[in-house]
Curated annotation (Swiss-Prot):
EC category: transferase
Name of the protein in question: E3 ubiquitin-protein ligase SopA
Cell compartments where the protein resides: Secreted; Host cell
Catalytic residue positions: 753
Lineage: Bacteria, Pseudomonadati, Pseudomonadota, Gammaproteobacteria, Enterobacterales
EC number(s) recorded for this UniProt protein: 2.3.2.26
Length: 782
C-alpha cells in the first residue's frame, strides 16, 4: 500500500507536530532503513533521544504543547499517550512511503485488541480541512481514546475510515446532550469529544424537559466543561441551569429564555446574546468573559471579566440599533430616544430593576473607568436626542439613582448634565412628599435615593424648614434604615444639626424636653424626642416626637397612639386634650392626615350613633356625638335638665326594663354584620361599644367630675349586660363584671366614675380582643 505524504495538509497541524514529522524525514532521507519504534511522552526535549544508524531505533520525546494538543482528560491518561509508527522505509523515491498490507493488518488488529475492551470505539486523528492520516498512524490513550482539535466524531472499530454522522435535528442534539450530561452526573469522566457540542442546534429546546430536575434546583447539578461554540440556542429555554467552564464562542442565544441561568468560568466571547423578554430573573455571569458579545440593556454583569476593547466593528443586528462599548462588551442602544425607548432603557424603577443604567453600574468598582466611559457615551446619546424636560421627567428618579453617585460624579460631562435633572427631581419630591408619607424605603431607596435627597438638602438648606415634613422623613429613614451606610447616617446627623440651629427651629429645643434634654439629639435610642416638625401654617407652632412615634404615625397600625407627642407654641408645651387630631393634622401637620383618615375609616363606632340619633330627627345631637369622637376631651356637657330629659326620651325606648330591646339588639347586629356571627364575637363587639358609651358618660366627654348623663350610663351598662348573657367567658371574672355593673349604677357604695370604668374595660379589650376594639373605638380615644 502506497501513501503519499503529500496527502497530509501539514499547514493545519500544530507547529510541534510539523517538527516531529520533519525530523523523521531528515533521519530517513539518506537511505537509512530505520525502524521508528515509538514516540513517547517523556520530560526530555524533542531532540534529546535521537539515535541514527542503519538498523537503530529512533525515539522522540513529546513536548508539552503536543501533549496539550491531544487533550487528555487527566495526568494518568497523558502519561499513557502513545504514537506508534512501524515499518516506515524511505525508498528515496520522491518522498513515497511504503507500508505493507500485512503490517497494516497487524497494526489494526493490535489496536483493536488494545482498545475494544475499554471503550468499544476508536477515534481516528483528523485535522480540520485535511484528509485522514495514513492507516496505522493513530493517536490514542491506553484507557480511552482522545480527539484532537479537529473534533472528529467516533468511527466504528474496523478498517474503514468512514465517520458517524452528526445529529440532524435539535431533538437529536438534545438527546445526545442528555446522554452526555447523565454520564457525567453518574461520575464518568467524559472525553473532550464527549463534551464537544460545537455547531450544535438546540433551537426551541426547553432544557427542563430533557434534563433531570436536579439540574434546575438551586445548588443542583452542573453542566461542566462542555463546548457549545458556534451553536444555536434561538428560542430555547435554559432557565435555572448552571454552566461551568463551558465555551459558547460565536454561539447565537437569540430570544433565549435564561431566567436565573448561571454562567461561571466560561468563555462567551463573540456571542449574540439577546435573551427573551419572558426572562423573569436575570442570568448571572461569574468569572466569565464576554469579549465583543452583544448584551441587552437589562443584563447583570456583576461577575464579568472585562478587558480593553479591540478594534472590532459593532455587531450587525437585523432590527438595527446603536451600540456603546463597556470595556470589550457591546451594549445595545435605541436608534431614537422615543417615549418607549426612554422607559425601556432608562426606567429601572418601572422595569423590575432593569435598565442600561443598572447594567453598566452592575460591574464591580475595579472597572470604574470603563463604567464612567460607557455612561459618558450614554449621556452624549441622551444629549444628542434633544429630550425635553417632560420627556425625562418619568425617569428622573432612575437617572439620579445612578448618575448622582460616584464614580460618575467625578465626570465633568456627566455632572453637568445630571445637575438640572437632580434639581427637578428634588423639587418634585418636595412638592409630593412634604404633606404625605414617603413610601416605605427598601434597600434600593435607602442606598440610591436617600443620599441624593441629602445632597439636595445640603445644596438647598432653605428647604429644610420650608419642607420640614419631607426633611424630617428623610432624616428619619437615614437614621433607621438598616441598609443605609454609616456615611449616609453621618451626613444625615450633620444636616440635622444645621436644621436645629435655624432661627425657626432653635426656640423649640431648649425646653428640657428635646433629645438628650440639653437641646441636642440623642441618636442612641429611638425613645428620645429627637424630631421636630414645623407647622405648615404657623411658624410659632411645632411638634416634637420620638423616632418610634414618628415611624408609627407615618405607617400606623390599629394600635397606633395619635397623641404621643409634644405640641409646642413658642417653645412651650401646650395641652392637646381639647384639640381634634384630625384638625391639627389638616391645618398644621398634613404629613399625618392621610394615614390618620385611613385608620379612622376603619373605626365603625359612628354606625351605632346613626342608628340611635338619626340625622333627620336628631341632627344637632348627632353632630355633637360625632364631633366628640374626634377629641380626647369635650367642652360640651349634657348634664343640664333639658339635655338629660332629651337623652332619656331617646334612649328609654331602647332600654325597656334596663335591657336592650330585641328590635334594637337586632339593629346593632345588622349594622355590624353580626347576625350570623358566634355569640362570642357578638359579645366582644357589644363589650367594645359599651366602653365607648362609658367614655361618653365620663367627665372627659359629656359628663363632669360630679355628674354624668344617666341615659348614657344606663345604655353602656345594658350593652355590657347583653355581652355577659352571650358570652361570660370574655370577661375577666364574674366579680369584675359585677364591679363594673355596680359602678355604672352607683350600687353597693361603688365608686361611680365612669372614666375609670371606661379605662378598665378598654384595657381588658385591648389585651384579649384588640382587633375588635380597634374596629370600633374612635382614634382620638384609643
Amino acid at each position: 500500500m502506497k501513501i503519499s505524504s503529500g496527502a497530509i495538509n501539514f499547514s493545519t497541524i500544530p507547529n510541534q507536530v510539523k517538527k516531529l514529522i520533519t525530523s523523521i524525514r531528515e533521519h530517513t532521507k539518506n537511505g537509512f532503513a530505520s525502524k521508528i519504534t515509538s514516540v513517547k511522552n517523556t520530560h526530555a526535549s524533542l531532540n534529546e533521544k535521537i539515535k541514527t544508524g542503519k538498523s537503530s531505533s529512533i525515539e522522540f520525546a513529546l513536548p508539552q504543547k503536543i501533549k496539550d494538543f491531544f487533550q487528555p482528560k487527566d495526568k494518568n491518561t497523558l502519561n499513557k499517550t502513545l504514537i506508534t509508527v512501524k515499518n516506515i522505509k524511505d525508498t528515496n523515491n520522491a518522498g513515497k512511503i511504503n507500508i505493507s498490507a500485512e503490517d497494516v493488518s497487524k497494526m489494526n488488529a493490535a489496536f483493536m485488541r488494545k482498545h475494544i475492551a475499554n471503550q468499544s470505539r476508536d477515534y481516528n486523528y483528523r485535522v480540520t480541512g485535511a484528509a485522514p492520516l495514513p492507516g496505522g498512524v493513530s493517536v490514542s490513550a491506553n484507557n480511552r481514546p482522545t480527539v484532537s482539535e479537529g473534533r472528529t466524531p467516533p468511527v466504528s472499530p474496523s478498517l474503514s475510515l468512514q465517520a458517524t454522522s452528526f445529529p440532524s435535528s435539535p431533538a437529536d442534539w438534545a438527546k445526545k446532550l442528555t446522554d452526555a450530561v447523565l454520564r457525567q452526573k453518574a461520575g464518568e469522566t467524559l472525553t473532550a469529544a464527549d463534551r464537544d457540542f460545537s455547531n450544535a442546534d438546540f433551537r426551541n429546546i426547553t432544557f427542563s424537559k430533557i434534563l433531570p430536575p436536579s439540574f434546575m434546583e438551586r445548588d443542583g447539578d452542573i453542566i461542566k466543561g462542555f463546548n457549545f461554540s458556534n451553536s444555536k440556542f434561538t428560542y430555547s429555554d435554559i432557565s435555572h441551569l448552571h454552566f461551568d467552564e463551558c465555551r459558547f464562542t460565536y454561539s447565537t442565544l437569540s430570544d433565549v429564555v435564561c431566567s436565573n441561568t448561571k454562567f461561571s468560568n466560561s468563555d462567551m466571547n463573540e456571542v449574540f446574546l439577546q435573551y427573551s423578554i419572558t426572562t423573569q430573573q436575570q442570568p448571572s455571569f461569574i468569572d466569565t468573559t464576554l469579549k465583543n458579545t452583544l448584551i441587552r440593556h437589562k443584563a447583570n454583569l456583576s461577575g464579568v471579566i472585562l478587558h480593553e476593547p479591540d478594534n472590532s466593528s459593532p455587531p450587525s443586528v437585523s432590527r438595527g440599533g446603536n451600540f456603546i462599548r463597556l470595556g470589550d462588551i457591546w451594549l445595545q442602544m435605541p436608534l431614537l430616544w422615543t417615549e418607549n425607548a426612554v422607559d425601556g432603557f432608562l426606567n429601572h424603577e418601572h422595569n423590575n430593576g432593569k435598565s442600561i443604567l443598572m447594567t453598566i453600574d452592575s460591574l464591580p468598582d475595579k472597572y470604574s473607568q470603563e463604567k464612567v466611559r460607557a455612561m459618558e457615551d450614554l449621556v452624549k446619546s441622551l444629549r444628542g436626542g434633544r429630550l425635553t424636560e417632560a420627556g425625562i421627567r418619568p425617569v428622573e428618579s432612575s437617572l439620579v439613582s445612578v448618575l448622582a453617585h460616584p464614580p460618575y460624579t467625578q465626570s465633568a460631562l456627566i455632572s453637568e448634565w445630571i445637575r438640572p435633572v437632580q434639581e427637578r427631581f428634588f423639587a418634585h419630591q418636595c412638592q409630593t412628599y412634604n404633606d404625605v408619607p414617603l413610601p416605605a424605603p427598601d434597600t434600593y431607596y435607602q442606598q440610591r435615593i436617600l443620599p441624593v435627597l441629602l445632597d439636595s438638602f445640603d445644596r438647598n438648606s432653605a428647604a429644610m424648614t420650608t419642607h420640614s415634613g419631607l426633611f424630617n422623613q428623610v432624616i428619619l429613614h437615614c437614621m433607621t434604615g438598616v441598609d443605609c451606610t454609616d456615611g449616609t447616617r453621618q451626613k444625615a446627623a450633620a444636616l440635622y444639626e444645621q436644621y436645629l440651629a435655624h432661627p425657626a427651629v432653635s426656640p423649640h429645643i431648649h425646653n428640657g424636653l428635646f433629645g438628650n434634654y440639653d437641646g441636642s439629639p440623642d441618636w442612641t435610642t429611638r425613645a428620645a424626642d429627637n424630631f421636630l416638625l414645623l407647622s405648615s401654617q404657623d411658624s410659632d407652632t411645632a411638634m416634637m416626637l420620638s423616632t418610634n412615634t414618628l415611624l408609627t404615625m407615618l405607617n400606623p397600625t390599629p394600635d397606633t397612639a395619635w397623641d404621643n407627642f409634644y405640641l409646642l407654641r413658642a417653645g412651650e408645651n401646650v395641652s392637646t386634650a381639647q384639640i381634634s387630631p384630625v384638625e391639627l393634622f389638616r391645618h398644621d401637620f398634613p404629613v399625618f392626615l392621610a394615614a390618620f383618615n385611613q385608620q379612622a375609616t376603619q373605626r365603625r363606632f359612628g354606625e351605632l350613633i346613626d342608628i340611635i340619633l338619626s340625622t333627620e330627627e336628631h341632627g344637632e345631637l348627632n353632630q355633637q356625638f360625632i364631633a366628640a369622637t374626634n377629641q380626647k376631651h369635650s367642652t360640651v356637657k349634657l348634664i343640664d335638665d333639658a339635655s338629660v330629659s332629651r337623652l332619656n326620651t331617646i334612649f328609654d325606648p331602647l332600654l325597656p326594663e334596663g335591657k336592650l330591646s330585641p328590635a334594637h339588639y337586632q339593629h346593632i347586629l345588622s349594622a355590624y354584620h353580626l347576625t350570623d356571627a358566634t355569640p362570642q364575637k357578638q359579645a366582644e363587639t357589644l363589650f367594645c361599644l359599651s366602653t365607648a358609651f362609658a367614655r361618653y358618660s365620663s367627665s372627659a366627654i359629656f359628663g363632669t367630675e360630679h355628674d354624668s348623663p344617666p341615659a348614657l350610663r344606663g345604655y353602656a351598662e345594658a350593652l355590657m349586660q347583653k355581652a355577659w348573657e352571650l358570652s361570660p367567658a370574655i370577661f375577666p371574672s364574674s366579680e369584675q363584671f359585677t364591679d363594673w355593673s355596680d359602678r355604672f349604677h352607683g350600687l353597693h357604695g361603688a365608686f361611680t366614675c365612669t372614666s375609670v370604668v371606661a379605662d378598665s374595660m378598654q384595657r381588658h379589650a385591648r389585651k384579649y380582643f384588640p382587633s375588635v376594639l380597634s374596629s370600633i373605638l374612635p382614634l382620638a380615644w384609643a
